């Protein structure tokens, strides 16, 4: 039996009505789940991020980051960075971390986004091919850590098995899952998913390091002598996975965080790399006044190297949640399936930047290194991704 007094206190009394329609099993699961939740924290999230949502319009303490521009490097500098990078990779100083917890829903595709194929080559394979090329160059397999989610973990692993890991050594491919967090209605109420459980969604890419630690892989990296983690996501089809130049740049600069950026277009809805209160960080486009966003010259493209010692030091530090509103399937009061705007709470990995003591940015050419695949048609679509991959001779 649910505690009516507690539920009323936190605006969740509707669950008592849901409980009346449930089987004994479902009631038990609901009760157990509610016991594991901190309803006060959930109410605070709702109040802070939805009811009192703030947009950053005062940037008096926000400045441009210091950055290098790849196109301004001399031939000698490029060769030197590449030499340093290949040597570091050969010595096992880098691991690669891929964030791939999403589904291909917006592409009109059922399945993990990474298994979506463009002209018979999946997004996973595009990245695996680059790691295989590095193996040929260095003689070393780089450990590849792939973050999945509850919604795609099993399918992702089965996909890799069906493709024989694209010829990569399966002992060097490691999967782990990101955590979930409850979703809420626009009234701040917990909702039920189509299986009559409290609806949860992946907690955003910011949980990547805690999940990596929980899986034991952070310790494994340390034991293996890894010094840097190269991080990227599955969305960018032109990503250069641990390209030797960036590896060498990372290794020589020896910063807590080394990041890639591109020159943003006016009005482009990507986060901006900025220096705020003496710390390099990312301000999300949705949290910035559009006119102010256009003042900054470096867009975040989700490609970074993190010093492993830095991650080990800060992995337990708290990160703030951010709000996203998505249409999600859920049960109505009669247990019918409906789709409604739902509040998702997400951690962003770049909020860990606030704890870094050193940071450097390398601006790279957009046309060579950035082509996000987000939509079935139009902007950032299958068509644009296909054209860019062909232009760069990647398919």
UniProtKB/Swiss-Prot annotation:
InterPro entries: Nucleotide-diphossugar_trans (IPR029044), UDP-sugar_pyrophosphorylase (IPR039741), UDPGP_fam (IPR002618). It comes from the Bacteria. GO terms for molecular function: uridylyltransferase activity. Its EC number is 2.7.7.-. UTP binds at residues 99-102, 113, 178, 204, 235, 344. Keywords: Nucleotidyltransferase, Transferase. Signal peptide: none annotated. Pfam families: UDPGP. PANTHER family: LD24639P, UDP- GLUCOSE PYROPHOSPHORYLASE. Belongs to the UDPGP type 1 family. This is Probable uridylyltransferase SSP0716. It comes from Staphylococcus saprophyticus subsp. saprophyticus (strain ATCC 15305 / DSM 20229 / NCIMB 8711 / NCTC 7292 / S-41).
């Amino acid at each position: 039996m649910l505690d009516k007094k507690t539920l009323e206190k936190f605006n969740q009394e509707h669950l008592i009505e849901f409980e009346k329609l449930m089987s004994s099993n479902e009631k038990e699961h609901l009760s157990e789940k509610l016991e594991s939740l901190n309803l006060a924290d959930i109410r605070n999230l709702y109040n802070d991020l939805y009811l009192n949502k703030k947009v950053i319009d005062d940037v008096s303490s926000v400045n441009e980051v210091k950055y290098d521009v790849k196109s301004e490097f001399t031939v000698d500098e490029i060769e030197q960075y590449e030499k340093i990078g290949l040597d570091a990779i050969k010595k096992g100083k880098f691991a690669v971390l891929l964030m791939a917890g999403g589904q291909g829903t917006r592409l009109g595709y059922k399945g993990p986004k990474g298994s979506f194929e463009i002209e018979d080559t999946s997004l996973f394979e595009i990245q695996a091919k680059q790691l295989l090329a590095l193996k040929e160059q260095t003689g070393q397999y780089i450990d590849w850590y792939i973050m999945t989610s509850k919604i795609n973990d099993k399918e992702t692993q089965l996909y890799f098995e069906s493709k024989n890991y694209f010829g990569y050594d399966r002992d060097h491919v490691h999967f782990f899952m990101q955590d979930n967090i409850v979703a809420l209605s626009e009234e701040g109420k917990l909702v039920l998913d189509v299986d009559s459980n409290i609806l949860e969604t992946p907690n955003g890419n910011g949980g990547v390091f805690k999940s990596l630690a929980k899986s034991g892989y952070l310790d494994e990296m340390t034991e293996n002598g890894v010094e840097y983690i190269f991080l990227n996501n599955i969305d960018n089809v032109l990503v250069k996975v641990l390209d030797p130049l960036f590896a060498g740049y990372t290794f020589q600069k020896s910063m807590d965080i080394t990041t890639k950026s591109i020159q943003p277009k006016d009005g482009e809805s990507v986060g901006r790399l900025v220096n705020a209160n003496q710390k390099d960080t990312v301000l999300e486009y949705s949290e910035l006044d559009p006119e102010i966003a256009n003042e900054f010259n470096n867009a975040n493209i989700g490609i970074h190297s993190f010093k492993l010692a830095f991650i080990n030091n800060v992995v337990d530090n708290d990160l703030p949640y951010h709000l996203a509103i998505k249409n999600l399937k859920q049960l109505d009061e009669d247990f019918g399936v409906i789709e409604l705007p739902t509040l998702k709470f997400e951690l962003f990995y770049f909020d860990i930047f606030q704890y870094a003591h050193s940071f450097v940015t390398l601006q790279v050419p957009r046309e060579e290194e950035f082509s996000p695949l987000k939509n079935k048609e139009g902007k950032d679509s299958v068509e644009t991704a296909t054209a860019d991959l062909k232009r760069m001779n990647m398919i």
